[in-house]
Amino acid sequence: MASLKLTKNISNRFGCTLSEFWKALEESPNSMGYILGALSELFLKKHLESKGYEVIRIVEKPAGGNDAKSSEARGDFYVRKKGSKNDAWLVIESKGLKSNSEFRGKKFNNWEKVFRFLAPLAFPKKGIKTTIYKKGYIKYTKAKIAWKANHSGKRFPAFSWNRTNPGPISCDLTGLWKNRKDLELYLSSLPPKAFTEKSYRNCCGAVAVLETHKPNRRAGAKTGKIQAAPLVADFCVLAIDLFLRTGKHEFVFANPHELSHSPTSPEHLYQNYTIDVLIPNKKKARPIISPPWYLGYKDCVKKTKPKYRKLDPTQVDHRQD
């Protein structure tokens, strides 16, 4: 019955059969991405409601168009505890993982390339976090000097990376291999098909990278700098759906103010953060989540204390009312 209803709805809405609809999706990665994004929002809403939260969808484009979009409502949902009467909400943004992280531009099409990626994560150099922090600060300083040269007397936002978790990569692969030679032997023993796009798409390649993808051209409110990434202040909590790498619509959460911002524009986030790397047959298929990422929404809010916002009625999506 459900299948017949789906077939009828697709025929009425799109004028095609179910198989034609699916073929169109397969041949249009962008369309597939939009549907996955919509599903992520659907499952995130259900997840939060099951945990005792009131969830109100934020309209993508309010009456009046983009000019009427509030800077305080740049996410997908307003969220607060069920039963609360306080006008105090957290704006939640839902995103998915980058679908082509492993194979775009033939990134990991042989074991040598994968080795160069994994070695620094499996055998980090002593003081590497300090080194990453310093490199980020050097980039920041250069960007600040260049910006102030054209904006005399104006203030460039401060550099606010966390020294404990600097940069966009948060995973730790130490202990999986005895030494670099052991890693080399492991990777070189894998069959060639482990480094193909097909294997990576099916999550059975040499690695599965949990990398965020947040393309969103935004201009900084203070600097006017434009980057293809969200602003740190756009939302209160970022929720990432891990489906593309774990096969389940499950979420991890982060406070954007706890993530390392773009080193060249402190008002922006990075477009991509690496949450973890799964190694088939070597590391359990479950991701290991560590700060600034959290497995639970409640845990993220409790430990990072994001700032609450007032609900703006003009930003609420009433389509389902």
Regions found by a protein language model. Give the residues of each.
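C-terminal/domain-terminus segments
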Residues: 245-321
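Active-site beta-strand-loop-beta-strand hairpin of nuclease catalytic cores
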Residues: 71, 78-94
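Interdomain/boundary linker segments immediately adjacent to catalytic/signaling cores
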Residues: 1-56, 60-70, 81-83, 102-104, ...
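Residue-level detector of flexible, active-site-proximal loop/helix-junction positions
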Residues: 62, 98, 258
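Catalytic cores of nucleic-acid endonucleases
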Residues: 88, 95-247
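Extended hydrophobic/aromatic segments used for targeting, binding, or gating
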Residues: 73-76, 99-100
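Conserved hydrophobic/aromatic positions in well-ordered beta-strands
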Residues: 78, 239-241, 252
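A short catalytic or substrate-binding loop motif that flags glycine-/basic-rich loops and adjacent residues
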Residues: 68-72, 231-232
